C-alpha cells in the first residue's frame, strides 16, 4: 500500500494542437495545453526562421509537429524540454487516447466507453449506481486511470484502489486527469485484485466498485471464488457495482451479465440487478 506524490509540469500536444500551430499565420498563439482539464491557455511563440514552436516547457521543431499532426491516435507531451509519446511498449502496447478525458488503450482495446458516453460520464454512471456517500470506505478493484477512485474520493469517501499493471500506473502518472490519484488522499496498491483482496479484513468496506478487464483477459476476476472475497470484505448492507460490458453482446454464446448475476447470488448477494446505463450489475450484501 503506497501513497505516491506527483507534480505534473507538462505541456500536452495532440494532432489538433500541432495543426493549429502549423497553420497559424501569427508569431504567437494561445492554446490549451492540459487536454482541456482547465480553460487555461498558454502562449506559444512561433519562430518560422528557426522552424520551432516555443512552448512553456520547451521548444518543438516543425518537423516533430508535422509528425504529431498526422498522428490522431496518440497524445504527446513535453517534459524537461523533450517531446515524448504517451505510450509504453512493454509486454504489450499501452497508450493514452486523446479523448476528453483520455482513456487508456491496451493492445487496441479501450478501457473506457468512448462512443455513447465519454470516460467521465462512464465513471459517473458507475459511481451513481452504488450512490457513494461521504464517510464511506470504498474499494476500487481495478484502478486504470483512476477516474472511479477520484470521483469516489471527491464525494468524501475513503478510497483504496488496486492496479495490477505497472505500465497502466505509469500512464496514469502522465495523464493530467489522473493527477488527484497521486496527491496522497487515495491509497494505491500495485497487485492483482484477486490476491490483494485477501489481505483485507472481513466487513471492511461499504462499497466495492469492480470494473475488471474483459472476461477473455481476466476471467479469474469474474469467478465465484473472487465474488466470495468481495462478499467477505463488504459490510452488511454494503453495495457492489460490477461492470460487465454491453448486455447485448455475448462471449462464446454466453450472456456474461446473466452468469455474473447467478454467481453473485450463489455467494450470498441479494437485490442483484442489471444497470443498463452503466453496462453493469449492482448487488447488496444482506444485513442479516
Curated annotation (Swiss-Prot):
Gene3D superfamilies xref list: Vaccinia Virus protein VP39 (3.40.50.150)
GO molecular function term, any single one: methyltransferase activity
Pfam families hit by this protein: Methyltransf_11 (PF08241)
Disulfide bond residue pairs: none
Matching InterPro entries: Erg6_SMT_methyltransf (IPR050447), Methyltransf_11 (IPR013216), SAM-dependent_MTases_sf (IPR029063)
Protein name according to UniProt: Uncharacterized protein MJ1233
Organism: Methanocaldococcus jannaschii (strain ATCC 43067 / DSM 2661 / JAL-1 / JCM 10045 / NBRC 100440)
Amino acid at each position: 500500500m503506497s501513497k505516491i506524490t506527483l507534480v505534473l509540469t507538462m505541456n500536452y500536444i495532440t494532432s489538433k494542437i500541432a495543426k493549429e500551430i502549423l497553420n497559424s499565420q501569427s508569431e504567437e498563439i494561445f492554446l490549451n495545453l492540459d487536454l482541456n482539464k482547465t480553460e487555461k491557455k498558454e502562449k506559444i511563440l512561433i519562430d518560422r526562421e528557426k522552424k520551432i514552436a516555443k512552448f512553456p516547457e520547451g521548444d518543438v521543431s516543425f518537423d516533430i509537429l508535422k509528425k504529431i499532426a498526422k498522428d490522431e491516435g496518440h497524445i504527446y507531451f513535453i517534459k524537461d524540454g523533450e517531446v515524448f509519446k504517451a505510450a509504453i511498449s512493454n509486454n504489450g502496447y499501452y497508450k493514452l487516447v486523446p479523448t476528453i478525458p483520455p482513456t487508456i488503450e491496451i493492445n487496441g482495446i479501450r478501457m473506457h466507453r468512448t462512443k455513447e458516453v465519454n470516460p467521465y460520464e462512464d465513471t459517473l454512471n458507475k459511481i451513481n449506481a452504488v450512490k457513494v456517500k461521504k464517510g464511506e470506505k470504498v474499494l476500487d478493484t481495478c484502478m486504470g486511470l483512476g477516474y472511479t477512485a477520484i470521483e469516489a474520493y471527491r464525494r468524501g469517501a475513503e478510497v483504496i484502489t488496486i492496479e495490477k499493471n505497472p505500465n497502466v500506473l505509469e500512464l496514469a502518472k502522465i495523464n493530467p486527469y489522473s493527477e488527484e490519484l497521486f496527491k496522497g488522499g487515495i491509497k494505491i496498491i500495485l497487485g492483482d485484485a484477486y490476491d490483494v483482496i485477501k489481505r483485507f479484513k472481513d466487513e471492511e468496506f461499504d462499497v466495492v466498485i469492480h470494473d475488471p478487464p474483459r472476461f477473455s483477459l481476466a476471467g479469474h476476476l469474474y469467478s465465484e471464488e473472487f465474488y466470495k472475497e468481495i462478499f467477505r470484505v463488504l459490510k452488511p448492507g454494503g453495495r457492489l457495482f460490477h461492470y460487465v460490458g454491453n448486455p447485448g453482446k455475448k462471449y462464446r454464446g454466453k450472456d456474461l451479465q446473466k452468469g455474473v448475476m447467478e454467481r453473485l447470488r450463489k455467494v450470498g448477494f441479494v437485490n442483484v440487478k442489471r444497470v443498463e446505463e452503466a453496462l453493469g450489475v449492482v448487488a447488496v450484501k444482506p444485513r442479516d
